[in-house]
Amino acid sequence: MIPISICIIAKNEEKHLHTFLSSIKNHMKDYPHEILFVDTGSTDATKKIASQYTNCIYDFKWINDFSAARNFSLSMASHDWILILDCDEYVTSLNPQGFQQMMEQYPTGIGMITRLNHYQMNGQDSVYTDQVERFFNRKYFHYESIIHEQVVPLSSGKADKVSIPLTVDHCGYMGTVEELQKKVERNNTLLLQMLEQTPDDPYLYFQLGQSYNAIHDVEKTCYYYGKGLEYDINPQIEYAQLMVIGYGHSLLNLKRYKEALFFENIYDEFSFSADFLFLMGLIYMNNALFDKAIQEFLNATRCPKCSVKGINSYLAYYNIGVIYECAGMPNEALNYYKICGDYEPALSGIQRIAK
């Protein structure tokens, strides 16, 4: 088996570190690997905890550049094949044979891991899923961009992107208000610095929208998503889909319901997405176009994949139930509430109707 280096950069991560590193240890115990840990200036017990899992610990002076720290970690690795993980990502599922298969079949490809992002929405824990580039051969790739760094080929050409059987729980959006505020301030300083250099990059507007969304600053979230969508972006690109969905939800949160109806103009480009169809249901629902809302929620349930858990199942059925209940059609509402499983708001709806 070809050994790999798991490269980690960290600063003051004692809160997450035991859970994170033990998740790697448990899932990688039968596969040859090293854990390479780069500390960028911790003042807590981060390095002490890391030393319980690896002897490969290095210091890197923080220079406000995530790619510089990442690339330093690549340079210190013992092996060419690199797996990148962050300390707030806990490995929950991994088949190490997937590494071997990709290395043999796609030696110049990039491995995509599955990330389950946990966050709070309307007071409830929610999850959205994405795939991120994390496994590659350092002979062919490095990192670029000072923030939200990206894997870039060292030479010209387009790399194959391959899903590998590794899933992590990402809890970076689940901190305290103070922790999230500090993280956003750090990130936005770097993003705005990059925006001065490349003012026509829609990806930077997307990331600024993401930052403000994390701290529930709806006005700025809406502004930056909207700026990003002024550019012509391929709907198949994941961040474009996330930006459209985020912009739509921010318009609804700001009660700009009529304005949100312009999403009808991009329906054909994004209707392959359950998340978009669900959003259209919400837009119609908030504009009192209830028949159209029901149709879009039903359309969402016919899509096999979604980013946010429940969008193509119980959340869509629940909203249909709400529409029928408000329309004075309790039997129809009850039918939809009952297929929502143990979703608490649906159970409450069943109890209301039963009274």
Annotated model-derived regions:
Residues 82:
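Short aromatic/hydrophobic "clamp" motif used to bind/position activated sugar donors
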Residues 16-18, 44-52, 94:
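Acidic helix N-cap motif at the loop->helix transition within catalytic regions
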Residues 8, 12-27:
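Short, well-formed alpha-helical segments that are part of the catalytic scaffolds
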Residues 33, 48-68, 72, 76:
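Conserved donor nucleotide-binding strand/loop of the catalytic core
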Residues 71-74, 91-220:
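Catalytic-site signature of metal-activated, phosphate-bearing donor transferases
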Residues 23, 38-49, 62, 86-90:
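A conserved acidic beta->alpha catalytic loop
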